[in-house]
């Protein structure tokens, strides 16, 4: 079986290409960086195409383009969980093995592979961290929590402050979309469970996994996680945190550079996410990779762009301008970076502890099944055990097919 790859005659063609990614929250910093490329290579200009801010809709747009053989998209940004699906369907081409940059974190590089071949190059990795309202904790004279029990106690203490009795404790992204999959996976993994174990076996109905789901269900029931969070995606949760509706927030690092400037550094801080029952928090690995579409006409320019977009210079730029987590380990310890972005060591520790979402060619079906089963449990319409058992049956069917 011959998969499409970047070898042979078509590698010589150079001309204009497009770079396709989700919505840019950085206030035009992506375009600014592309302007540098366009000045340097006027015959191989890159135009930016921004898709939705939502992962599920981005994926749909990319699939529609691939299925209609559209040549509009050349280099595309893929959530790392989509790589297998796009490679298996031959919507993206194999990348030459010598593309791997020196110093890239190995586990991050591997997110671009499918069946032992490389189909995508990471340009940002990602793991969540805990944002906390420093101002509220100081008013209540409370330490930064290290455990789930501490989070509960800190929330109770802050609720005793004047006009604070209704503040939410711990926020996240619990709307019915990809964020829900990331958030529930963290509770399940932290409690010692797994949706699918390393051998590919469905284990979402194990006692440990059910405990993880139960912990989230209980947090909604007790209003530790505010009910409003059932509608929250990334930006909603950031708004909730900024406007004082929630004390702690699990979110990705992009929020630090792009949005919290208005809140001011004296009002918020970043810390590791809390352990649950003595088990260290297991963050969900995020990140985006760039891949070259099979329909791309100018594959030589596309590959040259991918190498430039994932170079150390570009990664440093995207770290400074968008607080994107870089793919190179050394950028997390570089003195001037840590001075500017003091959360980097916390983020690196989160990345090192992070676990991927289930690997599946039919990832779209897997994540939809997770959302369909878990959401009603969080709403209190069904219990954790029933949700887990229903999900296990559904996942077994998807994986078998």
Whereabouts are the PLM-identified features?
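Hinge/lid segment of periplasmic solute-binding proteins
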Residues: 78-127, 140-143, 152, 163, ...
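Short, well-ordered beta-strand elements
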Residues: 10, 14-24, 44-51, 74-75, ...
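Extracytoplasmic "Venus flytrap"/periplasmic binding protein-like
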Residues: 33-107, 111-113, 135-146, 240, ...
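Glycine-centered hinge/linker elements that transmit conformational signals in sensory
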Residues: 155-157, 199-230, 273
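Short, solvent-exposed loop/beta-turn-alpha elements that line the ligand-binding surface or hinge
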Residues: 93-104, 162, 168-178, 191-211, ...
């Amino acid at each position: 079986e011959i998969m499409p790859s970047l070898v042979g005659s078509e590698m010589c063609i150079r001309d204009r290409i497009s770079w396709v990614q989700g919505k840019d929250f950085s206030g035009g910093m992506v375009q600014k960086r592309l302007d540098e490329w366009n000045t340097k290579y006027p015959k191989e200009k890159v135009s930016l195409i921004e898709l939705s801010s939502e992962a599920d809709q981005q994926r749909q747009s990319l699939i529609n383009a691939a299925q209609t053989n559209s040549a509009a998209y050349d280099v595309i940004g893929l959530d790392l969980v989509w790589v297998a699906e796009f490679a298996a369907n031959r919507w993206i081409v194999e990348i030459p093995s010598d593309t791997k940059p020196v110093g890239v974190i190995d586990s991050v590089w591997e997110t671009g592979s499918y069946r032992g071949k490389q189909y995508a190059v990471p340009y940002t990795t990602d793991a969540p961290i805990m944002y906390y309202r420093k101002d509220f904790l100081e008013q209540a004279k409370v330490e930064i929590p290290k455990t789930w029990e501490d989070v509960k106690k800190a929330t109770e203490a802050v609720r005793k402050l004047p006009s604070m009795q209704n503040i939410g404790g711990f926020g996240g992204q619990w709307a019915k979309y990809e964020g829900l999959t990331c958030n529930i996976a963290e509770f399940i993994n932290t409690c010692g469970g797994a949706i699918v174990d390393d051998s590919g076996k469905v284990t979402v109905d194990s006692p440990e996994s059910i405990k993880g789901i139960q912990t989230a269900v209980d947090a909604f029931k007790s209003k530790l996680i505010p009910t409003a969070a059932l509608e929250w995606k990334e930006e909603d949760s950031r708004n909730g945190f900024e406007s004082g509706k929630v004390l702690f927030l699990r979110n990705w690092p992009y929020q630090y550079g792009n949005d919290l400037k208005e809140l001011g550094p004296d009002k918020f801080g970043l810390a590791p996410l809390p352990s649950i029952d003595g088990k260290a928090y297991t963050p969900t690995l995020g990140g985006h990779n760039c891949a070259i579409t099979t329909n791309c006409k100018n594959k030589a320019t596309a590959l040259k762009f991918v190498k430039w977009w994932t170079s150390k210079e570009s990664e440093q730029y995207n770290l400074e301008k968008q607080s994107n987590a870089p793919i190179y380990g050394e950028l997390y310890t570089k003195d001037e970076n840590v001075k500017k972005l003091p959360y980097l060591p916390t983020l690196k520790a989160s990345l090192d502890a992070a676990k991927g979402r289930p690997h599946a060619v039919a990832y779209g079906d897997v994540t939809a099944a997770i959302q369909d089963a878990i959401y009603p449990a969080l709403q209190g319409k069904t219990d954790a055990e029933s949700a887990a058992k229903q999900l296990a049956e559904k996942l077994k069917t998807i994986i078998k097919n």
